[in-house]
Regions:
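N-terminal secretory signal peptides that target proteins for export/translocation
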Residues: 1-2
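Short coil/linker segments at helix-helix boundaries
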Residues: 24-27, 34-48, 57, 65-120, ...
Length: 280
């Protein structure tokens, strides 16, 4: 079985891109985003940290940095099924987790402050939802810890509010699709009911809509990575391969895309197990 990474978490994973105002979206942010989608997570995290210092009010650097830190942590843990043991043996993981939690907390506080001033700020709603989704995905899948339920509910409410105000907010559409996918695939039936329900079908509909929308470059790329990840997990490997081929043209340095494509068609197209680790 192959384990192929993109992140992607969540996501969430995951991947992060942004529909940003001109104030937040300078070339340095694009550099951080491109590094992330090329699977150069340390570079992406460093660039995002520099952006935090240069624009104290921008939320995007916190989302990019926490996503990059999550993927660094995931890569450092490796493939061990015993996630707790792997974390204890990982020399770099405690500092990565500490940095992730610190930046998540700061970003959450900034987003909540913006929403106190303007409850209809759909970008603040999105970033609050996405930061919380990153937190939930890191703990649930990467660390194997069932925690973060308050973050889950805040993510769900924030993303739903953003989409109610702006149904064309494609980043929120992708993040909300990941909520549906996570609940549908990671929770028992009873827990799914408690968490408000989840639907893999709805997740694919949302991801496909966002991937096919006429959006800014990194917004579309994030949606395509999300759809690719879901397709890989669902063993719809022929379509996943076609998407990966398109993405590899824009992100030739992404060795995880290359690893996936190197397994095609022998592994991918015949439906044998291929696992990605790129959400959300």
């Amino acid at each position: 079985m192959y384990r192929v990474a993109f992140l992607v978490l969540i996501a969430a994973v995951a991947l992060p891109a942004s529909s940003l105002s001109a104030r937040e979206g300078g070339p340095a942010l694009a550099d951080a985003q491109r590094a992330f989608f090329n699977a150069r997570y340390q570079t992406a995290a460093d660039l995002a940290l520099a952006l935090q210092a240069s624009d104290a009010e921008a939320l995007a650097p916190y989302e990019v940095r926490t996503s990059a830190l999550h993927f660094q942590l995931r890569d450092a843990l490796g493939k061990s099924p015993d996630k707790g043991k792997a974390f204890k043996l990982c020399a770099t993981c405690p500092e990565l987790l500490k940095a992730f939690l610190t930046d998540t907390k700061k970003g959450q506080a900034m987003a909540r402050a913006r929403l106190q001033s303007d409850p209809a700020d759909d970008d603040a709603l999105f970033f609050l939802g996405k930061l919380n989704l990153n937190y939930v995905w890191l703990h649930l899948e990467t660390l194997g810890r069932k925690t973060g339920w308050s973050e889950y509910w805040e993510a769900r409410r924030s993303l739903d509010a953003a989409l109610e105000d702006n149904p064309r907010h494609m980043r929120a559409r992708v993040a909300r699709a990941w909520v549906d996918y996570i609940v549908a695939t990671k929770m028992t039936r009873g827990t799914r009911w408690v968490l408000g329900g989840g639907s893999k079908k709805s997740a694919f509909i949302g991801a496909r809509e966002a991937a096919g929308a006429d959006s800014e470059f990194f917004v579309r790329v994030e949606a395509e990575f999300a759809l690719w990840e879901m397709l890989v997990r669902d063993r719809q490997l022929a379509e996943a391969t076609a998407i990966a081929q398109r993405l590899a043209l824009d992100f030739p340095e992404n060795h995880k895309l290359a690893n996936f494509l190197n397994a095609a068609p022998a592994q991918n197209l015949n439906g044998r197990g291929v696992q990605s680790d790129t959400a959300p």
